[in-house]
Amino acid sequence: LYDLDKVISWTCSKFKNPEITLLGHSRGGGISMLKASSDTRIKNVVSWASPSNFLNRMPEDRINLWKEKGVVFVYNGRTKQNMPLYLQFYTDCIEHKEKLNMQKAVSNLSIPQLIIHGDSDPTVLVKEAKDLHKWNPKSELFILKDANHVFGAFHPYNIEKLPTDLQFVVDKTIFFINQ
């Protein structure tokens, strides 16, 4: 959130009255929603396949291992890598529980919000998108049939045309921002 604030402040110092939309995918969408709820410079917020809680998918035994080792690894199916998730993330979430309360943040949003999620997302379940929408009934929720967590993209992506699902998500987002 600190880094995002610095980027927004820089943008506001370089452009007169910028119309800022925050857009984030997965955890980035969560960070965007948290920031948008507390920053009047933000005009819209869009989340793609974003969690409604940063820690709700971490079982207790995994948290204990995290505390013991200082790091857990999360497999990224697109890149085939085990991505490190350091204990600092967990301790930040615990120490700043109130500031990182997604339900409270989303409930307090007074700007336009678009939530997009695939109903075949194995990483962040579609229930989380429905929770976000429930907490802000004024939000626009769009659930894309048969779409996964990355809307058909993969890594490395070496094709000029976007996957059909991702192109639809991009088009929907642009339409939302331009309303």
Task: Outline where the language-model segments fall.
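Alpha/beta-hydrolase active-site loop
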Residues: L1-K14
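Acidic catalytic loop of the alpha/beta-hydrolase fold
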Residues: S120-V124, H149
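Hydrolase active-site cap/lid region
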Residues: T40-Q88
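Catalytic active-site module of serine/aspartate enzymes centered on a nucleophile-bearing elbow/loop
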Residues: V150-F151, H155-Q179
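Alpha/beta-hydrolase fold nucleophile elbow
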Residues: F15-S26
